[in-house]
Amino acid sequence: MIMPTPFVSQLSPSLFTTLREQLEKKGFVISIPPHTVFQGRSSTVSCTVYQSGKIVVQGKGTQEFVEFFLEPEILHSFSIQNVQQDLRPRIGVDESGKGDFFGPLCTAGVYAPSIKSIESLYEITICDSKLISDAKIPSLARSIRSLCTCKVITLFPEKYNALYANFQNLNALLAWTHATIIDDLAPKPTGDVFAISDQFASSERVLLQAVRKKRADIELIQRHRAEQDVVVAAASILARDAFLSSMQTLESQYQVRLLKGASGKVKQQAKEILRDKGQPVLEKVCKTHFKTFYEVLGSTS
């Protein structure tokens, strides 16, 4: 497989702290290898700042990271050219929350029915929600809703846990939510409209079979890193917006603070909720099939 070409530039020392803080907010793991000021790593990209001021970005997510974050928000210069705009009407689907111990699973779909609607998504610089700060998500979500037809399924923990007990498999549950949204959004007849989704299972067959049970005639495209498609990216923003607002709802309802992710800090917080609120409340704010849940229960027995 041909790897993307690394991006190399020069970074002013005055921006070192700003970049590091922004990467930390995005969940990058920070380290300090020899001869560097720091290095930030995510699942798709590494960003290394050397003592000389040279900055090197590598990994399969390089272009998106540079085009939508590094250049506009840090460097304030532009060298990477936009890819050719795909203006075909289509449905994009994505989810948020599947890796978070606390909170819901949110799946969102966006149907961009016209060239104008897709051009508008490009104009407001829609990109993968993981490259956007949480503070910017709500306003972008409002813009997307004004431009496209949208659908969101939010499974709060109580409902999520019941469905997981039925499906016994996260990918099967994801396939059901994705297929339901595609069926709801697809025009009838489908015509030339197709659907695009991230390939979240090892086999494309998992989602394809779920879609075929509901809608036999729509073309389905599954890709790794599908969020690079502007309509899927729009769906990722809607899903993230639903996740963030739902977390606030749970925090208010149960008077607890809920951290995102599944880190050691999250585990410690779960222990505190179990101690202060009891197991029934913990089960209403978390995904009980996570190993963390059983570790927390075991630590108090």
Curated annotation (Swiss-Prot):
One of its GO terms (cellular component) is ribonuclease H2 complex. It holds the Pfam family DUF3378. Its EC number is 3.1.26.4. The keyword Hydrolase applies. Endonuclease that specifically degrades the RNA of RNA-DNA hybrids. Manganese or magnesium. Binds 1 divalent metal ion per monomer in the absence of substrate. May bind a second metal ion after substrate binding. This is Ribonuclease HIII. NCBIfam families: rnhC. It catalyses: Endonucleolytic cleavage to 5'-phosphomonoester. SUPFAM superfamilies: Ribonuclease H-like (SSF53098). One of its GO terms (molecular function) is RNA binding. InterPro entries: RNase_HII/HIII, RNase_HII/HIII_dom, RNase_HIII, RNase_HIII_N, RNaseH-like_sf, RNaseH_sf, TBP_dom_sf. One of its GO terms (biological process) is DNA replication, removal of RNA primer. The lineage of its organism: Bacteria, Pseudomonadati, Chlamydiota, Chlamydiia, Chlamydiales. The keyword Hydrolase applies. Its cofactor is Mn(2+); Mg(2+). Residues 88-301 form the RNase H type-2 domain. Keywords: Cytoplasm, Endonuclease, Hydrolase, Magnesium, Metal-binding, Nuclease. Its main location: cytoplasm. A divalent metal cation binds at residues 94-95, 198. Belongs to the RNase HII family. RnhC subfamily.
